[in-house]
Amino acid sequence: MEDRIPVADLQHSAGSLAAIAFHNIEHCTQKTSSAILGYYHLPHIGSEHSSSDNADEAAKYTKAFIKGRKVAVKVANLINQGKTIHPVPLRVTGSGLVGGPPCEGHARLIEGITWFEKTQFHHQSLRPEGNHSTASHYLHFSTPLAQIIPGAEGRTQPMDVVQDITLISGMCLWASRIIQSSMPRGQRLDVSRLLSSKITLYEVEYLARAVPVIADLAAALSANNPYGPTPLNIRLDIPSFHYYHSLEERLRDGCCTFPEALQWMHAVEKRHHQLSRVFCRLIDHELSRRWVGTPHRRKLDVQVSPLADLVFQLICDSLANSVLPDVDDILQIVQTEDTTWVRFYSLVPENEKVTDFRALSYLFYVYQVLRPALEQTHVNTTEGDEATSKLLISVDDAFERRIYSRSQKLLKKLRASLPASAAVPHLLEVYLCRRIFINSNETGSNLYLDDPSPEPFVLRLCQGLAPEGKQELVRAQDRHNTRPETIKLDAFDVVEGLYGSHIAEVLKDLFAEVGLGA
């Protein structure tokens, strides 16, 4: 049976209402006439990898496919414990999308050309849609090593060497446009822009896209060993103090007072807590759907941005005293409060040490990836014990790739410094394929940068959607009492068209619990 996985093309330009066109992802990315520039669907392994007449460009697509496909197969072998009899927890199909930003420039430099393998997760039951036992996603798997976990592949039970597993993800707050509008250059702060109770399309869509993948991975990792499972943790990184460096520029320019700056930071803190709660609650909800009927439900350790709250509070304390925060003072306090930060910071080369708040913000994203690897755990002390590993699995958008590339470099240094008895950490990167493209992916932009929220969206086209998808959009039309030719959609309507009514309704309820809505 064909999977009908929709994507949306968000057409938006200054001064006009944003228009949404829905397409079937496999139909609209045919190599001869792709509606999403730079992306092509490959229905099977032997397909051509690019329709480009440029030999260099075609070579990039071919290389991306070969490299991505190899890692995808290794991931399936690892998670399925070498089993091949269907149904297995994770199946890589050999079909997928290859692509990225359509032309050279900053976006392609960050993301490159990527192979997104059509990946299917099999579950005993997915409540409330109990008859849907397979979830499909387009995912890119990446590791700098020849093996995901050296020494594990080729074993009868490859996951036996894994001491614990940590799934790592995160998201931004609001969207870039809203944050920038709250601090217009050369003008006073406008904190009201951050105090709106409206959610952005970026926030809702990212959660609808990322959380099911996190839950599917958690369930797949548990499927082969339900009675004696490897410890499984989830770490979410949601920014708080990380936005301060932009505010600091306004303070130094005299565009805001210390009380105004403090109010702005408190608005960020409020959104941080709201998004953290929704993220955690949605993970819990999606896991409960996948683990229904299993011998026992696992209790996961879920943490959000450890240590970041201390930095946030130190910054706010300085602002409350009308003093510009000093990054060196804050670093000194953090060094005395957290041993994992001390171990992490010792891995950072001298020429990459923190000199300002912008650098601290970026380095903290890297720290959150490495933190599970730095935390003290049991090590093998008996002679002859086999070496064990910690498996870190990140789930994120490809435009955050530089965070994980930096993390891999520091992990390599960490592994070299560990005693022979220590659990060795390895990071598997999982990247989500976009489901909303901006202006047909003309410049390779992403939803966070170009989200027109809180403006509504006009439905322009819904070709290629499954009948139930079209029914969902008709229901949206009825809710908003709009004429067929001018159907206006809010963020939840767009998510409903992309991911279905169930997750859209759950998200609507969870956001309402924290005082946010469309």
Swiss-Prot record:
Motif stretch (Conserved DDXXE motif): 396-400
Entry annotated with the keyword Transmembrane: no
GO molecular function, one term: ligase activity
UniProt keyword annotations, A-Z: Ligase
Reaction(s) this enzyme catalyzes, per UniProt: L-tyrosyl-tRNA(Tyr) + L-arginyl-tRNA(Arg) = cyclo(L-arginyl-L-tyrosyl) + tRNA(Tyr) + tRNA(Arg) + H(+)
Its EC number(s): 6.3.2.-
This protein's pathway: Secondary metabolite biosynthesis
Entry annotated with the keyword Metal-binding: no
Domain notes: The conserved DDXXE motif is essential for catalytic activity.
Record-stated family: Belongs to the arginine-containing cyclodipeptide synthase family.
Function text: Arginine-containing cyclodipeptide synthase; part of the ank cluster that mediates the biosynthesis of NK13650 C, a highly modified cyclo-arginine-tyrosine dipeptide connected to homoserine, citrate and aspartate. Within the pathway, ankA acts as the scaffold-generating enzyme and is responsible for formation of the cyclo-Arg-Tyr diketopiperazine (cRY) from L-arginyl-tRNA(Arg) and L-tyrosyl-tRNA(Tyr). The ankA product cRY is desaturated by the cytochrome P450 monooxygenase ankB to yield a dehydro-cyclodipeptide intermediate.
Name of the protein: Arginine-containing cyclodipeptide synthase ankA
Species per Swiss-Prot/TrEMBL record: Aspergillus thermomutatus
